[in-house]
Amino acid sequence: MGYGDADTDLLLGNPLHLRAVLEAPEYRGMPVVLLHECYPYTRQGGYLAAVYENVYLDLSYGIPLLGYGEMLAFTRQALGVAPISKLMYSSDGIVVPELHWMSAIDGRRVIGEALGELVAYGEAILTEAEAAGESVLRGNAIRLYRL
């Protein structure tokens, strides 16, 4: 629960509160997928994905409450903190099928733009950015969910 849930204290939505659970021996082997990019705590979610082997960060692009610029901002944050192998695309589409379609368009566009910036800044080469895009949009979910 978090952004968009009026009955939630957003301060309690910080994923760093999960550290005790993530460090518990009985949960270390269980994959944990942090949904909705932990918005507005994307950096913290990315940090958890970076330091815990079993934690992944889902980037949801169908949230109708966020505009393109904000989706691009949290995608940049996620790419700056989390390993590419721990990031996954999600449509977050609900109820109306068109939301999945709109999300797919926005998701590809935002991920492509953010990865393109990494190439422009010299932080990645084009083939690395293309491979990263494939991983985030498809490959990581296939591996994690054994599809």
Show the residue positions of the predicted features.
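Active-site micro-motifs of SAM-dependent methyltransferase domains
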Residues: 3, 95, 143
